[in-house]
């Protein structure tokens, strides 16, 4: 609702209000594949205390002395393999932008709602988008971290950054944060249909379906992070919906970094062992990723496939993420409409 303009003093500045913002946020992406862009992105990502919980005095000498001098070039080459050449950006940026634009169309019946998107690391930043929404008259904002399963290193750090922005604002918008939706029926159904649709396009049937989630250090789980349990539940619900057994369906964890023990079983080791044990055909889906990105397009579709074939496997297929598909957008829309209740 906008205040009655006739009641304002003649010299009162025009102030937009009465709008509701929906801010979709994903992890982030470098602006380019060059060394400088990669280093800037990795620095922001790897200095986040939610991501690397080691004390700075222990971690920073390793980060600034070794990691940021060696990994930008290596990771940049990996990004080059899966870069959206047409738009000169990563596919994560492409899909996240598309999701925001499609969400705005799906919420066309809610006249006071504005939809925008941001990245936790890189651009556009969460702070800049909150500021933009506020300037456009949004005095209430729904913050949607695009992670079906909650983890401190993903969902919590998005929330942290939003609250950090609010600390600097004199006139703060009301802020709601979207909880996880790891067991949502629409989400599970969308995953199941994506599996069925993809497998029906093949002329072979997999002996094993892996549901590969991004890993976190085991120490984070032991300190109370619910991520592992939520991944397992998502996996179980998907397996049951597909009518599979534990003999032909596994939950695994990928993308480990550093010397610590991470959640297991590890995806790369599992793929290698399956091939060595004589399993000839496997499919891999990434239920925890809303959009395809480096970890799915390069780490799974390229690296894992190569490892499987090198160790004796025959057929390997990667099932795309839901991305900006109609089924994927149905999931996101359902969550947004649910969380907007009481505001619209």
Swiss-Prot record:
The keyword Metal-binding applies. Fe cation binds at residues 214, 295. It is an enzyme of class 4 (lyase). Pathway: Porphyrin-containing compound metabolism; protoheme biosynthesis; protoheme from protoporphyrin-IX: step 1/1. Gene3D superfamilies: 3.40.50.1400. Keywords: Cytoplasm, Heme biosynthesis, Iron, Lyase, Metal-binding, Porphyrin biosynthesis. GO terms for biological process: heme biosynthetic process. The keyword DNA damage does not apply. InterPro entries: Ferrochelatase, Ferrochelatase_AS, Ferrochelatase_C, Ferrochelatase_N. GO terms for molecular function: ferrochelatase activity; metal ion binding. It catalyses: heme b + 2 H(+) = protoporphyrin IX + Fe(2+). It comes from the Bacteria. Disulfide bonds: none annotated. Its main location: cytoplasm. Its EC number is 4.98.1.1. One of its GO terms (cellular component) is cytoplasm. It is found in: Cytoplasm. Pfam families: Ferrochelatase. NCBIfam families: hemH. Catalyzes the ferrous insertion into protoporphyrin IX. Belongs to the ferrochelatase family. This is Ferrochelatase. The lineage of its organism: Bacteria, Pseudomonadati, Pseudomonadota, Alphaproteobacteria, Hyphomicrobiales.
């Amino acid at each position: 609702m906008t205040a009655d303009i006739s009641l304002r003093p003649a010299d009162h500045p025009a102030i937009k209000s009465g709008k509701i913002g929906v801010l979709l946020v994903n992890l982030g992406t470098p602006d380019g594949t060059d060394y400088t862009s990669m280093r800037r992105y990795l620095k922001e990502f790897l200095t986040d205390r939610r991501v690397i919980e080691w004390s700075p005095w222990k971690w920073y000498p390793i980060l600034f002395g070794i990691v940021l001098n060696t990994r930008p070039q290596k990771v940049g080459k990996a990004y080059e393999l899966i870069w959206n050449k047409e738009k000169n950006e990563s596919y994560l940026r492409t899909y996240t932008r598309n999701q925001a634009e499609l969400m705005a169309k799906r919420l066309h019946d809610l006249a006071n709602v504005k939809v925008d998107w941001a990245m936790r690391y890189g651009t556009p930043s969460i702070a800049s988008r909150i500021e933009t929404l506020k300037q456009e008259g949004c005095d209430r904002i729904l913050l949607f971290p695009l992670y079906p399963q909650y983890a401190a290193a993903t969902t919590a750090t998005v929330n942290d950054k939003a609250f950090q922005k609010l600390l600097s604002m004199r006139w703060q918008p009301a802020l709601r944060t979207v909880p996880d939706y790891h067991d949502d029926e629409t989400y599970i159904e969308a995953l199941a249909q994506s599996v069925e649709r993809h497998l029906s396009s093949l002329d072979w049937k997999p002996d094993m379906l892996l549901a590969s989630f991004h890993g976190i250090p085991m120490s984070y789980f032991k300190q109370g992070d619910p991520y592992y349990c939520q991944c397992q539940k998502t996996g179980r619900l998907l397996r049951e919906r597909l009518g599979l057994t534990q003999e032909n369906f596994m939950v695994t964890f990928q993308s480990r970094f550093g010397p610590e023990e991470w959640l297991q079983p590890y995806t790369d080791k599992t793929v290698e062992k399956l091939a060595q044990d004589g399993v000839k055909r496997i499919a891999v889906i990434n239920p925890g990723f809303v959009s395809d990105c480096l970890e799915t397009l390069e780490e799974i579709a390229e690296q894992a496939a190569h490892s499987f074939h090198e160790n004796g496997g025959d057929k390997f297929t990667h099932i795309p993420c839901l991305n900006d598909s109609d089924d994927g957008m149905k999931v996101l829309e359902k969550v947004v409409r649910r969380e907007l209740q009481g505001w619209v």
